[in-house]
Amino acid sequence: TIMMAGPMIICEGANVRHSAFLRGNVIIGAGAVVGNSCELKNALIFDEAQIPHFNYVGDSVLGYKAHMGAGAVTSNVKSDKSLVVVHAEDKDVATGFKKFGAILGDGVEVGCNQELL
């Protein structure tokens, strides 16, 4: 059984597996895999990205063929609840968000049980 709540686009050829929980604004690209017991919230998942098992991806972007190892998660709230600032190239950019997970580029590999802050 898959739980889906909220607006989403699941492209042709995407594979959403048993016990996945999709909520908020979610886009899953063609050929992407969202595995068993994974939760996605406000996530943009590009084509052929893999979130295969026991992952949480919130308020995040995963690039083409990015891969999250088993149990890897994105932390999307700062412990002090302040607004998130992203370092981009040579400057800091204020996002205006209290919640912002991770941006993974194309082909990025995240090891098992890693927490991306």
Positions of PLM-derived features:
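Structural signal for interior beta-strand "rungs" in well-ordered beta-sheet cores
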Residues: 1-117
